[in-house]
Amino acid sequence: MSQKRSLVFAIRDFPPGCGTHIDVSSSLNHPAEKAFKHPRTGDVSGENLSFAEAKPEGTCLKRESADQDHIFAAPEHNAKREPAGQDHVVAATTVAYATSSHRQKVEIGNSDCDPTPREKVLEVLSLFKQVYNQLDRDKKARRGGDFLDATSRIDLKTLTVLEKMGKQVNTEKRIGSVPGINIGDVFQYKTELRVVGLHSKPMCGIDYIKLGDDRITTSIVASEGYGYNDTYNSGVMVYTGEGGNVINKQKKTEDQKLVKGNLALATSMRQKSQVRVIRGEERLDRKGKRYVYDGLYMVEEYWVERDVRGKSVYKFKLCRIPGQLPLT
C-alpha cells in the first residue's frame, strides 16, 4: 500500500525592496473554474467576473399584498452616507506553497508603506485565488482520505488554509461598512466573503452578532430564484427568512420560526440598525452564482405568509439607504 504524500503550506516574508514582485490587478475578478450551485450555502466558480451593472436608486414604498398575515413596521429613520474607498494597490507579500511534488512561490504587489484597508482586502483575495488554483491543480485535492482531501469544495479547503495562515482581514464582526470593501465588489465564492470580513457565515444567509441579550444582523446574502424568491426592485428588497427546508423538496418542510437569523433581522428593524446586503446573482453563462456587495440597507418591516406548501415563511422588506454610490 502506497503512503499518501503530505500537503504543506509555508510563508516566506521578504523585507521591503527584496525579492521579485509582480503586480496584481485591482479587480476582484477570478478566472474560470468549475461551477457549484447551492443558492445560499454553495459557492460557485466561473468566468472572469466584473462589477455589477448600475441599477436605479428608488424610494422605498410600503408593500401591499393579500398574502400577508401580520406586518411589523420599523419607525422612521435618518441614515448617513457611508464613504467607500477608491484606491486599488496591493501590499507586498511573498507566499510559498510546497507539496511533495512541486514548490511554487507567489509574490503579491510591492509597497514601502503600511497597507491600507483596501490593499489588505485585495491582497488576501489574490492570495485566495492563488491557493485555490494550486489546490485545484494538485491531484490530492481530488482524492479520498482526510478531510482536506476528501471534500470536493476546494473553496472550503482554501478558506481553511488561509485561516491557518492567519491571512483573514476584518476578523472582528461589525455593523455597517467594512474597511476596504467597495459597493459593487464582486466575489466568486461565499468563502471569500468570510476571508474579507463581509459575511462570516458561508453556510448561512443571515450573519449576526450578539450584543447583550440581543442578536443583531450584520449582513445577509440574498438570492433570486430557487425556493427563497428574494426580490429586488429600485432599492427595495424582499428577503425570505431562514429555516423550514425551503429549497430542499426531498425533505419535510416546516414552518419558519422567529429565531436565530430571523430574530436578528427583526431586532435590526426595531433598533434601526444597518444591514450589509450581498446579492447572489446568476451568471450570464447560467453556471452558478456570483456575489455582489450592494451596500447598506435598513429593515423596514416583516410579516408571515404561506408558501406553496402551506408553511409559514417570514418575509423581510429592506430599503437601500439613500446617498450611497450606485452599483457600477
Curated annotation (Swiss-Prot):
The keyword 4Fe-4S appears for this protein: no
Entry GO CC: nucleus
Principal location: nucleus
Gene3D superfamilies, A to Z: SRA-YDG
Keyword line: Nucleus
Domain YDG: 176-320
Coiled coil residues, start to end: none
Compartments where located: Nucleus
Residues passing through the membrane, by range: none
Pfam families from the UniProt entry: SAD_SRA
PANTHER family from the UniProt entry: HISTONE-LYSINE N-METHYLTRANSFERASE SETMAR (PTHR45660), YDG DOMAIN-CONTAINING PROTEIN (PTHR45660:SF23)
The protein's name in its UniProt record: YDG domain-containing protein At5g47150
Organism per entry: Arabidopsis thaliana
Taxonomic lineage: Eukaryota, Viridiplantae, Streptophyta, Embryophyta, Tracheophyta
